[in-house]
Amino acid sequence: MILDSLLILAASVFCIGIYGLITSRNVVRILMSLELLLNAVNINFVAFSNFIDSIEIKGQVISIFIMTIAAAEAAVGLALILAIYRNRDTVDIESFNLLKR
C-alpha cells in the first residue's frame, strides 16, 4: 500500500515539473521544474529500493548521487542565470537567444 502512495506522489511531482518546464518563460522557474523532476526520480528510486529489498540501500545511494548532481546543476544554472541577467537585465527565456541582438 505504501508503494502505491509513493508512486502516486512521484508521478504527481513529475507531472508538476513537466508542466512547469513546458509553460514557464522564466529561467528560474525552469530550473526549479528540473529540480522537481529529479526529486520525483529520487522518490521512485527510494520507493522501489525499499519495496524490492529493504536490507540493501542501493536506491538510497543512487538517490544521494542524484541529489549531489542536482546541487551542482543548480549552482551552475544559477551562476549562468546571474551572468546573463547582468548582461541582459532580464531572466525571460526569449531574450537568451544570443544570435539575435
UniProtKB/Swiss-Prot annotation:
Membrane-spanning segments:
2-22, 32-52, 64-84
**Catalysed reactions, as listed in the record:** a plastoquinone + NADH + (n+1) H(+)(in) = a plastoquinol + NAD(+) + n H(+)(out); a plastoquinone + NADPH + (n+1) H(+)(in) = a plastoquinol + NADP(+) + n H(+)(out)
Q: Name one GO biological process term.
A: ATP synthesis coupled electron transport
**What's a GO cellular component annotated to this UniProt protein?**
chloroplast thylakoid membrane
**Protein's name in the database:** NAD(P)H-quinone oxidoreductase subunit 4L, chloroplastic
Q: Topology with regard to the membrane? A: Multi-pass membrane protein
Assembly with partners or alone: NDH is composed of at least 16 different subunits, 5 of which are encoded in the nucleus.
Query: Whose protein is this, by species?
Result: Chlorokybus atmophyticus
Instruction: State which Enzyme Commission number(s) the record gives.
Output: 7.1.1.-
- NCBIfam families linked to this entry: PRK05715.1-2, PRK05715.1-3, PRK05715.1-4, PRK05715.1-5
Molecular functions per Gene Ontology: oxidoreductase activity, acting on NAD(P)H, quinone or similar compound as acceptor; quinone binding
Function, please?
NDH shuttles electrons from NAD(P)H:plastoquinone, via FMN and iron-sulfur (Fe-S) centers, to quinones in the photosynthetic chain and possibly in a chloroplast respiratory chain. The immediate electron acceptor for the enzyme in this species is believed to be plastoquinone. Couples the redox reaction to proton translocation, and thus conserves the redox energy in a proton gradient.
Report the Pfam families cross-referenced here: Oxidored_q2 (PF00420)
Decide whether keyword Transport is in the record: yes
Predominant location category = plastid
Q: Which InterPro entries match?
A: NADH_UbQ_OxRdtase_chain4L/K, NUOK/Mnh_C1-like
Enzyme class, first EC level, given as a word: translocase
Identify its protein family: Belongs to the complex I subunit 4L family.
Record keyword Translocase present: yes
Keywords, alphabetical? Chloroplast, Membrane, NAD, NADP, Plastid, Plastoquinone, Quinone, Thylakoid, Translocase, Transmembrane, Transmembrane helix, Transport
